[in-house]
């Protein structure tokens, strides 16, 4: 039999072996991109783009995402030289050259979020999606990717907006863990009342959804008992933030 003391040690070891960091910020906030050593910044991010507002917004979001990833690597005590080792898979998904550390990026409007996951014992696979609220025909969109049973559940929800973004974000997050696009949204099975997700395009794990941030947020991580650390960029540094309410889904379990 395992003693209480040894059980606590095992739990602590489990948590230490797998750590998840999430940072978010807004491009309207100041951030010192030029502090990142030049050799850690790809050439396309060093350029100052001039064009329409949509192009400049997207470019600034990419720069902010790179900055946040740099900050998270330092927070996690990992070598920032990993930024030099980012490559794209056949599906176009950016990732590190080491299997046990993974990251994923999402942006919506002026908001950017980055997830960094470290798993000392096995391959890491993560995906996130953020969506800044905007007026949409939620029912019509649901009909494009959700099965009838999920649409019926959606029709009963008092908060239509929250219910829609929950259904959308969680799908994007699990698909992004493998670099699969939204063309496969309808392939993800979502059981909202059971808090279960099934997909052929991601591994086993857990997914967190919350509406407590300035945007709707979903993160998939290929592990159980996820305990992500959230950080908000305040214009000078990363500030830890406690998330008080969230939903935790079992994925492919």
Regions found by a protein language model. Give the residues of each.
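Core catalytic alpha/beta fold that binds nucleotide/phospho-ligands
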Residues: 14-253
